[in-house]
């Protein structure tokens, strides 16, 4: 007959293991398929194919954006943490607190194809493991591909294809200070390195300074042509009812401009010396003139592309796009402004046929033409906080991903679309580059030795006076401003 064993004397507070740690490690390795895997939780009810819910210990060392994995039918499926909440369970009227985490499926990862979505979900109580506990193979890229960011808590880089990025249009969104422009500048550099002609419309003056090492050209009307156009637009707005005579004069002036514009665009697109053009109109204070000239140059690019079908791959970058292609319909803009914006919008609708793509960069998503944004097939979204912008992005990402956007940190962004080797939205992170911060400060520093002011600025756009004039073009109130020398109304 069995007898009761003598109790083992233990100090108070000592926790003893009731199992063999070595066998436990072997068991976890069998479940995860990875040696030294870190168990973080177990799936719970209400999980779906796209979104996983799992319970973790309150002491688990995980965070928003981290990646976890589980095995389904012998395959390793990755998920990214989007959100978490506290929950309470009762066992015989004894409440217990816990954390329930939501994670979105990234899919199966391979170094060649990136993230491929998986068509099923794990069973209840399936174990989940931290991706940081294992090493992944680095992505295999072709000469037309490059890395755009790292997946948090992993050594995996997300890869984009430059051809899809250009042909199917892209949008870079985010409020000021989130790394949006830095990212756009990097994409411009990647495109130029792959022999893409890049035409940047930039009224901030930053691209000229930051991309100087790429030896850009600067197509633009002469100061005399710019003043003449402003005068003609002013005459149309202030002339007699209908302004028939003034409109005829304006049309002749624009036709004359079209000829010189065509020469500049042809020279740039056919040149082998430079793949970058920066279009600035800092001297122009009339916003209608700014829009007219922008439309003229972009339409000329489209005309060249039609005549030389796919002879060159062309990417048009619209920095601060809300000032160039605003959402005009139903917003109090006049018919002339609506016409100009719709003409620019045709590039988004027809550009792919001729090898012309758009890259829209803006901090005010809600104010950009939805005709253009809806044609973008790849989105890189940094922090946004206004509800109108988030409502639009509900149609791009899932609502769960959209809720993540206001919480993104600097240099963090959501990426999704045709150009990426990822079939589901993915949160990415980029490292802070101190050298770029120094370049940004130099670009913003006023030039005390300019010697000119306003229209006579001679420093290339870095002086205070130049920036003051530039800022006048960045308003969404399309009121007619008298050109210099015309005085007030």
Language model regions located:
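Conserved P-loop NTPase motor cores
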Residues: 176, 285, 289-400
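Conserved P-loop NTPase motor module
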Residues: 270-271, 412-489
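Conserved nucleotide-binding/hydrolysis micro-motifs of P-loop NTPases
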Residues: 86, 109-110, 204-208, 283-286, ...
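Short glycine-/polar-rich loops that comprise or flank the Walker A/P-loop
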Residues: 195-196, 274, 355-356, 374-378, ...
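Switch/coupling segment of Walker-type NTPase motor domains
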Residues: 189, 194-281
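Glycine-rich phosphate-binding loop of nucleotide-binding enzymes
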Residues: 143-219, 415, 449
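Conserved C-terminal "switch" segment of AAA+ ATPases
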Residues: 400-412
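Basic- and hydrophobic-enriched, low-structure N-terminal and domain-boundary segments
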Residues: 1-169, 187, 324, 368, ...
């Amino acid at each position: 007959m069995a007898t009761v064993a003598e109790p083992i004397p233990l100090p108070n507070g000592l926790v003893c293991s009731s199992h063999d740690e070595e066998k436990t490690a072997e068991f976890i390795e069998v479940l995860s398929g990875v040696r030294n895997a870190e168990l973080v939780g177990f799936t719970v009810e209400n999980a779906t194919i796209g979104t996983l819910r799992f319970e973790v210990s309150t002491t688990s060392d995980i965070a928003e954006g981290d990646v976890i994995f589980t095995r389904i039918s012998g395959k390793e499926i990755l998920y990214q943490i989007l959100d978490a909440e506290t929950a309470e369970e009762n066992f015989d009227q004894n409440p217990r607190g816990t954390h329930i985490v939501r994670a979105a499926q990234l899919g199966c990862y391979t170094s060649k194809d990136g993230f491929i979505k998986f068509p099923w979900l794990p069973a209840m109580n399936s174990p989940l493991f931290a991706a940081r506990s294992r090493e992944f193979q680095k992505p295999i890229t072709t000469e037309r591909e490059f890395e755009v960011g790292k997946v948090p808590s992993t050594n995996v880089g997300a890869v984009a294809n430059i051809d899809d990025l250009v042909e199917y249009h892209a949008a870079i969104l985010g409020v000021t200070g989130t790394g949006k422009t830095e990212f756009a500048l990097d994409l411009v550099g990647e495109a130029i390195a792959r022999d893409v002609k890049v035409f940047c419309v930039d009224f901030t003056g930053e691209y000229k300074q930051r991309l100087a090492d790429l030896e850009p050209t600067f197509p633009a009307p002469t100061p005399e042509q710019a003043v003449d156009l402003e005068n003609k637009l002013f005459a149309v707005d202030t002339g007699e009812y209908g302004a028939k005579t003034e409109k005829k004069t304006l049309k002749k002036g624009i036709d004359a401009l079209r000829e010189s514009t065509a020469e500049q665009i042809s020279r740039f697109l056919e040149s082998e010396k430079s793949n970058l053009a920066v279009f600035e109109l800092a001297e122009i204070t009339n916003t209608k003139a700014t829009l007219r000239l922008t439309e003229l140059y972009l339409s000329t690019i489209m005309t060249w592309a039609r005549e030389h079908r796919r002879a060159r791959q062309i990417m048009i970058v619209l920095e601060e796009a809300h000032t160039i292609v605003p959402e005009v319909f139903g917003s109090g803009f006049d018919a002339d402004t609506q016409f100009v914006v719709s003409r620019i919008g045709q590039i988004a609708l027809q550009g792919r046929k001729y090898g012309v793509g758009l890259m829209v960069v803006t901090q005010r998503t809600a104010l950009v033409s939805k005709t253009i944004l809806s044609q973008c097939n790849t989105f890189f979204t940094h922090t946004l906080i206004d509800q109108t912008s988030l409502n639009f992005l509900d149609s791009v990402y899932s609502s769960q991903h959209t809720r993540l956007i206001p919480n993104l940190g600097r240099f963090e962004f959501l990426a999704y679309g045709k150009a990426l080797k990822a079939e589901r939205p993915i949160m990415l992170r980029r490292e802070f580059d101190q050298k770029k911060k120094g370049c940004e400060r130099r670009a913003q520093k006023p030039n005390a030795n300019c010697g000119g002011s306003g229209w006579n600025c001679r420093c290339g756009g870095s002086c205070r006076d130049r920036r003051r004039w530039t800022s006048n073009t960045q308003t969404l109130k399309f009121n007619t401003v008298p050109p210099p020398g015309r005085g007030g109304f």
